[in-house]
Amino acid sequence: MVAANLEVPTSSSSSAATKRQKDVDNKLEKCLNDMLKLKTSSNNNSTSNSNNNAIMSHSLTGEHKDPKTALEGPTSSSSSSSSKYIGESQIPVPVQLYDPQKPLLQQQQQQQRICYPIGKSNSTSQLPMGGYQRLLQHQQQQHHQQQQQQHQEQQQYPQHKRPFLNWNSFACSAMNGASDPFMQQQHMPAHQQQQHLPHKLQQSYSSSHVPKQAPKSGLAMFLQKNTNKENKFGQPMQQQPPGMMPQMYGYQAPQQQSKIGYPRTGAPLTHSASFSSAQRPTALQFHQQHQQQQHLQQQQQHPQQQQHQHSSFGVGMMSRNYYNMPKQPERKPLQTFDPYAYPKPNQMQPVKYQQQQQHPHTQFQNASAGGGGGGAAGLQYDPNTNTQLFYASPASSSSNKQPQQPQQQQQQQQSQLQQSNSVIFNHSGQQHQPHQQQQNEMSKSALGLHFIETAKPVIQDDADGHLIYHTGDILHHRYKIMATLGEGTFGRVVKVKDMERDYCMALKIIKNVEKYREAAKLEINALEKIAQKDPHCDHLCVKMIDWFDYHGHMCIVFEMLGLSVFDFLRENNYEPYPLDQVRHMAYQLCYSVKFLHDNRLTHTDLKPENILFVDSDYTSHYNHKINREVRRVKNTDVRLIDFGSATFDHEHHSTIVSTRHYRAPEVILELGWSQPCDVWSIGCILFELYLGITLFQTHDNREHLAMMERILGQIPYRMARNHTLYSKTKTKYFYHGKLDWDEKSSAGRYVRDHCKPLFLCQLSDSEDHCELFSLIKKMLEYEPSSRITLGEALHHPFFDRLPPHHRVGEVSNKQPLSSGSSSRERSHSLSR
């Protein structure tokens, strides 16, 4: 279109106005003659030239003399070649086109926009014929092309930093059914694209020496212009050859919204994907300008050859689309993604890769033009939909820019899918998976991405080293967290659901602390040894199903059990267990720990919290003595858990083991320990199950020893002397063979008031109760060598009343009653 503007002469002299008018008429006649010559030499543009002649003849009749009628009169027909002469100082003005070959009513209905200069000038260069003079001057065309070339070269550099991209505005409109303006522009016919091309004001560049980045085409440009106020008036979108970009981006229908999915389960994304200014896409390295012009000419002359070359994914495609094919943005790991949001990828079916070998459209890769940390984007042919798909790969695998062989491409694609969990997008709305085809909902921010490279979830720990998780998180691509079961010094235990077996299990998540991680490895080793000796769990030790290292957190999967005997006791308001239930639980505990001792393994952390019911269902009944309801567990089958502190005889023995309330005296006095320390702990447990209270409720070593003497009698002199001679601790608890303890102090009065001899704690003088306390007294012997072994305990009269169906296994009389040699236990426990 040609810019025109006529002004009324302001001179007072009529002669000067007449002279100027004659000068204008001469120029118009000269221009008309030139246009007539151009008409005879041009055959392709006969129709447009005839219109121009009509317009010029109409202008010569004198309409240009009146400035009011000039704005409505002579104009030139709109064409794509003349649209490039629109200056920055021009604004579009709707006018009517005059065509003598068409009816007047039809011409009045057609409205077009013609840009006229802004401002006033007395020069005649702003007359309507100035546009035709520029068309005839070839030097001005070359000068204009050079300016465009310099303008594009200046835009190849990065832009200034801009505000944070807000994807929600576009995502919300997309989810409400708003179509993509980029897709609308690409699917329009060529003549409609020219008519609908927006005439926007050119953005004036600042005086800064930092150049701007090239305008982005497509969806990236749409998001940039709608989310950045600084670039609200950006450069207009440059046109692309029809049918080029839809094939490159895999679009088939602008009405159908794209869907994303995962290679395995198709779980939807759950977090927003927003990128800061440091993670913006970088510009693509373009070819030289003369090569670009050559390819553009080849496209116009040979459209069929262009389509064939585009299907081969050669270098020519990059040069032909240098201004509308920006480099794919670099995607960094999303720091807000949750662990369960990304299921474990599986290998693609070999049939799909065999189909890709048969097609020449195998791969097209672009190496990352920026620094490290970015990813490479490519195109992949889909034989089912006859479209091309984007795929993302990590930066480590995109260093090679040369085309690869089909077999190497298959291996690389499989490794990339396994390592980076790449998501392949089909913009037609269909996702191809080996086992299922499922369309998933997308997160709001993911709607604005052509492709996305999924990253490994970022694992966060709290100040104590516990793993931060939420209900519904999926660990190790298999175990879905359902609830938290308990917490300890080692970590937490959660209830998980095995997604493969559809079965609930218990998952022990160890703290991300070195000492607890090493202890977990020892526990796994002990559980594996136990599984070798007892594959069917006949000896009542918990069964380990699986284990794995989850980002520094050792995780062990166990069978799902019920409450611990301590938790059930606490929920029952510390109402003690009936004696028959205590007998059955004590028998199972002795039987299970004896199995460990027979295999030269010491548990070292026996307590009610580590004894779990297989099923903690209960019945309630009213107790008239205490005037309230009490619970009674239905099934007293138990399992032994927590082998984190289990120690083999040949392994290093820590100085302090066991929980305070169940710690044996040889451990407190640092005289060495072995299997008898477990027997002491079992004696304390039986007392607690029987009475519902802890036998030694203290947190101080000296007070603990004072309670022992108050309940069990004086500590032997030999142990006191050995403690004084061999103990490495600076604190000495004995003076001249006696415990250094002030009974008149507040702590001494507390021990005297709350502790009493063991046999005075019996609830009844019946034979059953006396047999239980007899067993407890033998388990609480000071001397480890004098302490009863678990083999002997299983033959204690207290277990004679146990029903046959409660006996796990008959203990043969021919087997040694002790769990190992008594001399070995005594020598090891008193090795100092």
Swiss-Prot record:
Taxonomy of the source species: Eukaryota, Metazoa, Ecdysozoa, Arthropoda, Hexapoda
Organism from which the protein derives: Drosophila melanogaster
Compositional bias ranges of the Polar residues kind: 8-18, 271-282
Segments for region (Disordered): 1-86, 135-158, 179-215, 258-419, 809-832
Keyword Transferase: yes
Subunit structure as annotated in this protein's UniProt entry: Interacts (via N-terminus) with x16 (via Arg/Ser-rich region). Interacts with eEF1gamma (via C-terminus); the interaction is probably direct, is transient and leads to phosphorylation of eEF1gamma by Doa.
Pfam families, per database record: Pkinase
The keyword Acyltransferase appears for this protein: no
InterPro entries, alphabetized: CLK_kinases, Kinase-like_dom_sf, Prot_kinase_dom, Protein_kinase_ATP_BS, Ser/Thr_kinase_AS
Name the record gives this protein: Serine/threonine-protein kinase Doa
Binding-site list for ATP: L485, G486, E487, G488, T489, F490, G491, R492, V493, K508
Compartments where found: Cytoplasm
